[in-house]
Amino acid sequence: VTGSKDEALVCITENDACGVDAIQAVLGCSLGKGNLLYRNTGKSAYTFIRRDTGRAVRFYMKKRNPGMEKEEYYQYLLECPVEEVFDYKETQVQLPERARIFRNVTCEICGEDAPEHRMRLQDGKKVCMDCFKEYTRGW
């Protein structure tokens, strides 16, 4: 796998840990390009999808050997075969839609712009998510 131009390669990350930084740097997947998607399960798992073929592979990080010191483990990660760090398998994934560019709308409370799909209507005003007051009735 090589770096991704536009959205040719999509990564669905299930965590927000440092491994995501490597994916961005090495493979070129990013939130801004729309080909890095965050699905918060907290697992050390990453699914890579090729848009041209629909082929998807999910990597899941194996448990760390508790007997290894931190520095020893880091060195091990740099030198060992990928099979010792990750379980991986082909999987079926619904291809996510390509990133869309939304029109910006000005919040009628704070005056800041936000994409229209993130705006809310409250008391007849278009408001951003920061200014929106959730109605919960306390439960």
Question: Where do the PLM segments sit?
Answer:
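Short, flexible, mixed-charge glycine/proline-rich loop motifs
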Residues: 94-104, 117-122
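Short Cys/His-rich Zn2+-coordinating modules
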Residues: 83-95, 109-114
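A structural-propensity feature for long, helix-poor, extended segments
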Residues: 6-41, 45-48
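Long, hydrophobic N-terminal alpha-helical segment
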Residues: 1-3
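Long, charge-patterned amphipathic alpha-helical coiled-coil/hairpin "stalk" segments used as oligomerization
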Residues: 30-72
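Cysteine-rich micro-motifs
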Residues: 121-134
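Short cysteine-rich clusters marking metal-coordination/redox-active sites
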Residues: 107-111, 128-131
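Short, non-ligating residues that shape and space the ligands of small metal-coordination modules
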Residues: 116-117, 137-138
